[in-house]
Amino acid sequence: MSVPSRKIRLIMELRQNGVSATPVLAAIERVPRDAFVSAPFSDQAYENTALPIGCGQTISQPLVVGLMTQALDLNDRHKVLEIGTGSGYQTAVLARLCRRVYTIERHGALLREAEARLTALGLHRTVVTREGDGGRGWPEQAPFERILVTAAALDIPKVLVAQLAIGGVMVLPVGKESGAQEVVRVRRTAEDALVTERLFPVRFVPLVDGLPPRDAPGA
């Protein structure tokens, strides 16, 4: 099956499983997922499955990318904070839908690879990257209208809530690494008021504090 046919099949699968927002589907269709997976997995790039990318991380299942992006309810005026750049695939989808993406990755090797991919796609003007501890957010660029976290937190991080604009939305997986996890949508309705919604079950790597040791693989 050709790449265009595989991509069409994937888009149809996402639509059938709850990704109904036309802008989100269009953004996913415009981002070449095969550019974000390593060569041994290139034949699976347009399968609805997560794939390893190194450093113990994965490129998320396209359905999860679609549903979480849809839950953000993005527009082209939004400034978005992404915690966990990973391969850069989710970053690229966000960049097709908003004004600016600020994305943080704790693994330097992954970030450098993601930066190269985003530059090759001409998205480097929309995306600002940082190697760092995502749990701390990016306070000097706050507030953000939208925040997306791509690793599972044990609870809703207060540090990130403080960087969310009033009226803003944060979408993140919540739960233990070895237990049940759910994607939660958080709306900050006032300075000290949040409205939360549980959306769907997922399985993500945990949100880890700090940076990996410099002698660790992929650091």
From Swiss-Prot:
- UniProt GO molecular function: protein-L-isoaspartate (D-aspartate) O-methyltransferase activity
Q: Which reaction does it catalyse?
A: [protein]-L-isoaspartate + S-adenosyl-L-methionine = [protein]-L-isoaspartate alpha-methyl ester + S-adenosyl-L-homocysteine
Q: Does the keyword Acyltransferase apply?
A: no
At the top level, the lineage of the source is Bacteria
- Does the record carry rRNA processing as a key word? no
- Show the GO cellular component annotation of the record: cytoplasm
| Gene Ontology biological process terms, A to Z | methylation; protein modification process; protein repair
Subcellular localization is given as: Cytoplasm
**Which keywords appear in this protein's UniProt record, sorted alphabetically?**
Cytoplasm, Methyltransferase, S-adenosyl-L-methionine, Transferase
Active site residues per record: S60
Pfam families the UniProt entry points to: PCMT
Q: Which InterPro entries does this one have? A: PCMT, SAM-dependent_MTases_sf
E.C. code: 2.1.1.77
Q: Which family does it belong to?
A: Belongs to the methyltransferase superfamily. L-isoaspartyl/D-aspartyl protein methyltransferase family.
Its biological purpose is as follows: Catalyzes the methyl esterification of L-isoaspartyl residues in peptides and proteins that result from spontaneous decomposition of normal L-aspartyl and L-asparaginyl residues. It plays a role in the repair and/or degradation of damaged proteins.
Listed name of the protein: Protein-L-isoaspartate O-methyltransferase
Q: Specify the species.
A: Rhodospirillum rubrum (strain ATCC 11170 / ATH 1.1.1 / DSM 467 / LMG 4362 / NCIMB 8255 / S1)
